[in-house]
Amino acid sequence: MKKLFAVLLAVLMVAVMATAMAETTLKVAGWDITTTPYYTAIKEGFEAANPDIKIEWVDLASQDYNIKASTMLSGGDTTDLYCVKELSDLQNWSKEGLVVPMNDMIAADGYDMSKYAGMDACYVSMADGQQYALPFRADFWVMFYNKDLFDKAGVAYPTNDWTWDEYAAIAREVAEKTGAYGTHYHTWLSCVANWAVCDGVNTLADGKYDDLVYFYELYQGFEDDGICMSYDELKASGMHYSGAFAQGNIAMMPMGYWYASTLIGYIKDGTASMNWGIAAVPHLEGVAAGSSFGSPTGIAISAASANKDAAWKFASWMCSEDGAKAIATTGTRPAYVSEGVAEVMASAEGFPTDETSKGALLPAAIALEWPIGEGVNEIKTIVNEEHTLIMTREVEINEGIAAMEERAAEYIK
């Protein structure tokens, strides 16, 4: 009898252990997974806190992410969660029932939504008022610069209060004195045109684009004089901005703050070796110093997920203070705002220690890159198309601007 009891007890223990060891694997779609360190920090932090759930990242190409993610969602792909790159995409996904509303989950957990500085509102559907994603990153644009090239040129580092005209003069001076590129513009529309929205008044969807002329002229002047790489060269080579700056022959590069984590990683693994810093992006006269543009990056749960409870557990952790601290260790700015998170950001290994770089973490204002509204997707397509024609010199700047306004007028309500 004792032997039988021992056998039954052993079987029971095995069954209990097997149940305890049962794991749920969540597939989470994002972009630039292998070059963005915070994905690893999120995975490791969450799995340590939740050993019964494993995270498997699904890496989609950055330039194709919106199209690929939308195709996967509409096709019923079993990927559980999707990072949200564009606010307009989430609006479409929610209208089509492709992602799960989170309001009931938020209420059931008593989840604190007060720590996002209002950025969570970007993920509320205009159609039904439901919350369809939570923000985990709060990206805004800064100026990255190579201190070594500035030192070589004998030029003072950028400050957090400088104008676009001052930036232009500095780019030319450093290029002239070092033979390096004074600045670098990636091929995105935002790298050239979005500075016009930093005043918080203009938008790229308002149908008025005269304010873009200054920035196109600025860029083309740089390109003509070899101060930056040409648009055609970059498009033909497919060079990624992260690798371009890491080569060490570019003095400045306006880019989203997310690049800080990549650059810190490059310094650690030897891909890059320069001393670097960040400053606030330049401003136009009459616009507050430290003004920038940006948008949150969020996480949404697929309606096709078979693991919605586990998916919510991951999303809510990723966007919480614990998740924010994990993200901040890589030099990335989380969406969750607290003193604890700020302390982690400032102490991230590899982050510049100078006061200008620290000050650049606190922008005066962040304008939304694209507003949310009817017709915005169509206008975005138009602006990008005409932007490409201007950048490739197929049309004159004023001709392209006029075409933007004429074509966008059809969608202005």
Could you describe each region identified by the protein language model?
Residues E23-I33, I53-V58, D80-L81, Y132, ...:
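Short, well-ordered beta-strand elements
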Residues E86-F140, S273-A280, S347-F351, G359:
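Hinge/lid segment of periplasmic solute-binding proteins
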Residues A171, L204-K235, V281:
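Glycine-centered hinge/linker elements that transmit conformational signals in sensory
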Residues A48, K54, G129, A153, ...:
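Extracytoplasmic/periplasmic substrate-recognition and gating elements
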Residues A279, T329-I382, L389:
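Long, aromatic- and glycine/proline-rich binding clefts that accommodate carbohydrate-like moieties
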Residues I33-K54, I382-V383, I401:
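Short, polar/charged alpha-helical segment
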Residues G45-K115, K152-G154, A244, N249-M252, ...:
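Extracytoplasmic "Venus flytrap"/periplasmic binding protein-like
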Residues M72, T79-D80, D109-L149, Y181-G182, ...:
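A structural signal for short loop-to-beta-strand junctions that line the ligand-binding cleft
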